[in-house]
Amino acid sequence: EGVGGTSLKGYVTTCYDTLVSLFGKPTYTDADPYAKVNCEWVLNVKYFEEEGMEDYDYDRELVTIYNWKDGHVPLNECQWHVGGKSYIADDLVNLIVGGNIKADYNANS
């Protein structure tokens, strides 16, 4: 699934190394200083809405985490853009980063 139909839903403040440790290597990088996006993760996040739901009772959300018009891949702590098709994307990313929750499996690593 591509990132078509996603748009900015919020922000997460963290550093590049934290994102790599949680989500693996970026899906996309571009060293061009004139590129709008130099670094992006494209993730299909599986989540459960309520406690006690069965393992097969879950939803997925397409999430993107990216820098915007920085001219380089930011390594220090900064405000990363969070994209998605709904505002759940922002909630999920901030929950994962804030709780330092590592995925059992990461297709990007």
What are these model-predicted stretches?
Residues 8-31:
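Amphipathic alpha-helical segments
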Residues 12, 45, 82-84:
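Short beta-strand-to-loop capping motifs
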Residues 34-48, 58-61:
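Short, structured protein-protein interaction patches enriched in aromatics and acidic/basic residues
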Residues 52-56:
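Intrinsically disordered, low-complexity Ser/Thr- and acidic-rich flexible linkers and loops
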Residues 60-91:
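Intrinsically disordered, low-complexity regulatory segments enriched in Ser/Thr/Pro
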Residues 94-109:
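Active-site or metal-binding loop neighborhoods of secreted/extracellular toxin and effector enzymes
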